[in-house]
């Protein structure tokens, strides 16, 4: 449950 949110939040947090 750490690899899923990371990829989904990484692009959203960077933007």
Swiss-Prot record:
Superkingdom of the organism of origin: Eukaryota
Note in the entry: On the 2D-gel the determined pI of this unknown protein is: 5.5, its MW is: 42.7 kDa.
Protein name: Unknown protein from spot 32 of 2D-PAGE of etiolated coleoptile
Organism for this UniProt entry: Zea mays (Maize)
Lineage: Eukaryota, Viridiplantae, Streptophyta, Embryophyta, Tracheophyta
């Amino acid at each position: 449950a750490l690899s899923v949110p990371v990829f989904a939040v990484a692009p959203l947090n960077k933007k």
